[in-house]
Amino acid sequence: MSEGPLIRVEKLTKYYPVRRRLRQLFDREQHYVRAVDDISLEVERGEILGLAGESGSGKTTTGEIIVRLQEATSGVIVLDGHPLEADSRADRKRFRREVQMIFQDPYETLNPRFNVFETIAEPLRIHGVRDRSEIARRVTDCLEIAELKPASNYLHRFPHELSGGQRQRVAIARGIVLEPKVLIADEPVSMLDVSIRADILNLLKRLRRRMGLTMIYVSHDLATIKYLCDRIAVMYLGKIVEIGPADEVIAHPQHPYTRVLVSSVPVADPDYVREQVSVDDAPPDQINLPEGCRFTPRCPFAQSDCAGCDHRLLERRPKQFSACIYTEAELKPRSIP
C-alpha cells in the first residue's frame, strides 16, 4: 500500500469522433464530442466522492473510464500508487479485482439466465476461486452483508423474481464479492422507489465503514450526494467546475452552475426561502463549444470577460475550488446581451 490518495486522475480526456454527413465530406477537419475534457481529481482512502451534473456533463463517462469500461483518449489514472498504463492481461485482471462498479439499472446488468448464486459466484470463478465451499460461503456472506436475509431465500431466484430494490442489492453483493478497494456507483438509486432509496444509501455507508471502501458516487441528485458523500465534484460539459466538501458546496456554492443545481433541490420546509437561480437556454452544442467558460451562454451572472477566461480551479473557500473567475460576492446579474 502506498501513501497518498487511493485514486488520482490526471488530465483525463475522452473525445468521440463525429461521423461525417454528406455535406461534411469535403471538410478536412475532424470534429469531436468532448465528453470528458482535461479533468484532474484525487480520491482519498475511505472517502466517498460525489460526481454531480446534469445529463451530458460527462460524469458517467468519467466513472466508466476509471473502471476501464471505456478507454480514455488521453490522461493518466493512478490506483494505489500504480499508474494504469500497462496493458498486460495480468494488470487488467488485478485492476478489475480492485475496482468494481454498480450500475443504474440492475435489471439490465443482471444476466436473466443466471440465478442469484450464479450471478455473484461468477466473478469469483473468473478470478480463480475454485473451491465450491469457499464460493458458497462468500456468496452467502455477501448476500447477508447486502441485507438479503436469509440468503437461502434468494440464492435460487432469477432477476425477474426480485423487486427493484432486491435486484440492486444483488448487484451490490456482486460488486463486493471480490473485496475491492474502490466501488463506483452510477446513479444506483435513481430507478428505485423513494421508500427504498434511503435503505440503499445507508447500505453504501455501512459498506464504507465495514470494508473500508473508497467510493465514487455518480448522480444528478444533489440531495442524495449531500447525504452520502464527503466531497462533491460538479461537472459541466466535460469539465469540473467546482469541487469541495459536500456540506460547503451545497451551503455556499461558488460556481453559478452549482448555484443553479442547488436552487433546484426540493426542501421539505414550507418556510424555507431559497435563492432563485434559473437558466432558460438549453446546453450548447457539444461539438461546437463556446470559448472560455462553457457555462457563459446560459449563466445568469455572465460578464463580457467570461468568454475569454480559462477553466482553472481557484480556491475560493478552504478546500473549495471553483472555475468561475468571480467570487461569490462578485457575482452580479448578467450585463451582456
Task: Identify the role of each PLM range.
Residues 3-5, 18-27, 32, 152, ...:
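Short catalytic/signature loops enriched in Gly
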Residues 177-181:
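A short, proline-enriched helix->beta-strand linker immediately N-terminal to the Walker B motif
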Residues 157-162, 166:
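Conserved ABC ATPase signature
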